[in-house]
């Protein structure tokens, strides 16, 4: 993984984790996966050289960045779904910051509607 992206992910996780600690209501939290889980997903994507990925529940884009970075290694593409527009905007800004937005479609849609 590119060192700039890795540093960005580390900082983002720390920021989200600190923010989550302040939120009493679980629904107000970012609900990011743990770095070890994200790294495992990245390894699995790389091992299978997956080309088309679907993420349901973008939240703030932490796992999205991991998935997109892994997908780009093999010319893959990620579609990520989130029902909350503000979270899609946040995730999109993170994707742009690390130049992964070109391989990722961020859709503001209920996953149930998308999967019909």
Model-derived features: positions:
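A short alpha-helical cap/connector motif
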Residues: 1-116
């Amino acid at each position: 993984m590119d060192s700039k992206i890795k540093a960005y992910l580390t900082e983002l996780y720390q920021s989200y984790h600190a923010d989550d600690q302040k939120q009493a209501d679980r629904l107000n939290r970012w609900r990011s996966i743990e770095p070890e889980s994200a790294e495992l997903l990245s390894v699995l994507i790389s091992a299978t050289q997956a080309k088309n990925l679907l993420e349901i529940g973008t939240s703030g884009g932490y796992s999205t960045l991991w998935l997109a970075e892994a997908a780009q290694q093999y010319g893959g593409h990620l579609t990520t779904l989130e029902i909350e527009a503000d979270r899609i905007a946040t995730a999109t800004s993170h994707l742009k910051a690390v130049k992964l937005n070109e391989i990722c479609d961020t859709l503001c849609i209920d996953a149930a509607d998308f999967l019909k």
